[in-house]
Amino acid sequence: MLEGSPNLPQWDNLPLAQQLTEKLNVPVVLENDIRAALVGEMWKGHCRHTHSCALIGIGTGLGSALLMDGKVIRGANNAAGEIGYMMFARDHLFRNWRNKGCFESFCSGSGLSERMASLRGENLSAIEIIQASQQGDPLAQSLVEEMADYLAIGIMNLVAIANLEKVVLTGGITRSADTFLPRVQANLDRHLFANTKVNIELSELWEKGPLYGIAILALATVYPSIQFMPEIQLR
């Protein structure tokens, strides 16, 4: 059942997996892309042998998936990890974030582009803004630094809640992580206590992560007696 997708309101409460199963006459498994990517990281990436970690995807939008005590967290309505809607200041309460979450507005490709357009009137892609920051553009540098600071705050909040062992970053924006990750790490080093220090790593699976993950989930659904990752609760 598809529920609560702000980008697909017309599909809300649609039993898509059931309909596809009936139409194709084969079992169909659906999963959120970032959660599927987390399962991929658990099988073949940086989340192997880890029981508490977060995968944060920074691309056009912002999302995350959480592994806590060996269990993939889904939440009451399958919406756990929607960190794009996190807020960080009192004045954020007085703005409408329904179409794009507060955190996502400051820490995503679309958010970067919208911030540049509102401040300078230029329609640049996030990659163009990052490149401009590398070339010394003051506004672009300020926006990238702002994104890094918000990302650090978001990670610190996740660590405070879940005491994570590791945070893995993925998504198109993280291919330019050398531009902003040192600032993120410096903020984490400055503000996290010694017993909550967390490793930040970049995914090496990229677009293969969700493919690996959904394959594992599909096999686990069709062949539930087989323990693909015995130490992990997938569903």
Regions found by a protein language model. Give the residues of each.
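A cytosolic small-molecule/anion-sensing beta-strand core signal
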Residues: M68-D69
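General beta-strand structural signal in soluble alpha/beta enzymes
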Residues: V28-N32
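Short glycine-aspartate micro-motif
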Residues: C53-G57, G63-A65
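Hydrophobic "anchor" residues
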Residues: L2, V72-I73
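Short beta-strand-loop/turn "lid" adjacent to the catalytic site in phosphate-handling enzymes
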Residues: M1-N13, E165-K166, G171
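Active-site glycine-centered loops adjacent to acidic/histidine catalytic or metal-binding residues
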Residues: D33, G59
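A short, polar/charged loop-to-alpha-helix boundary motif
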Residues: A79-H92
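ATP-binding/phosphotransfer module of carbohydrate and carboxylate kinases, centering on a glycine-rich
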Residues: Q18-V26, G40-T50, V72, R90-R235
